[in-house]
Amino acid sequence: MPKKEVVDAVTMKRALTRISYEIIERNKGIQDIVLVGIKTRGIYIAQRLAERLKQLEDIDVPVGELDITLYRDDVKDMEEPELHSSDVPVSIEGKEVILVDDVLYTGRTIRAAMDAVMDLGRPRKISLAVLVDRGHRELPIRADYVGKNIPTSKTEEIIVEMEERDGADRIMISKGNE
């Protein structure tokens, strides 16, 4: 399938900077925020948001990692689910947890992530930040912070590449068979 770059590194950086500003504005500061990245690329995005928030507000925002493997509604269909550990370095009790992921599609990943977060404690609020919202929701979930809205068909795929994992920052769209 041919891939087409739709967002380059500079545009991706701008989108993350905009999300950082929105987080500050909507929360009247960031003292009670915990960023929780959904494995795998959500973690890199959460770390970048924390770095940008530190530059803007001079506050270290805790960043956690969330593995949702056992919370997925398709886990029974997997032969042997690959388990990773979740690591949230602070208590989330009474905090605002911002779940961070690369792409919002059906909403099922986010539903699983909310279940996983609730097993860690009782946050005051859960919000969602995504780099890309591609539409096609199957559950009533929406992102509070969106880097880019990229409408797709159901047969297309959004591919997010991150420097930390893939060697480059970019977002591509892969055309499926329509």
From Swiss-Prot:
Keyword Signal: no
Annotated Gene3D superfamilies: 3.40.50.2020
UniProt-listed GO biological process terms: DNA-templated transcription termination
Entry's Gene Ontology molecular function annotations: RNA binding; uracil phosphoribosyltransferase activity
Highest taxon of source: Bacteria
Segments carrying motif PRPP-binding: 97-109
Keywords: Glycosyltransferase, RNA-binding, Transcription, Transcription regulation, Transcription termination, Transferase
Binding residue positions for substrate: 40-41, 101-109, 134
pH dependence (UniProt free text): Optimum pH is 9.2 for UPRTase activity.
CDD domains: PRTases_typeI
EC number: 2.4.2.9
SUPFAM superfamilies per the UniProt record, alphabetical: PRTase-like
Reactions catalysed, as given in the entry: UMP + diphosphate = 5-phospho-alpha-D-ribose 1-diphosphate + uracil
Family: Belongs to the purine/pyrimidine phosphoribosyltransferase family. PyrR subfamily.
Function comment: Regulates transcriptional attenuation of the pyrimidine nucleotide (pyr) operon in response to exogenous pyrimidines, by binding to the anti-antiterminator region of the 5' leader on pyr mRNA. This probably favors formation of a transcription terminator hairpin, leading to a reduced expression of downstream genes. Also displays a weak uracil phosphoribosyltransferase activity which is not physiologically significant.
Record PANTHER family: BIFUNCTIONAL PROTEIN PYRR
UniProt subunit comment: Homodimer and homohexamer; in equilibrium.
UniProt protein name: Bifunctional protein pyrR
Native source organism of the sequence: Enterococcus faecalis (strain ATCC 47077 / OG1RF)
Encoding gene, per UniProt annotation: pyrR
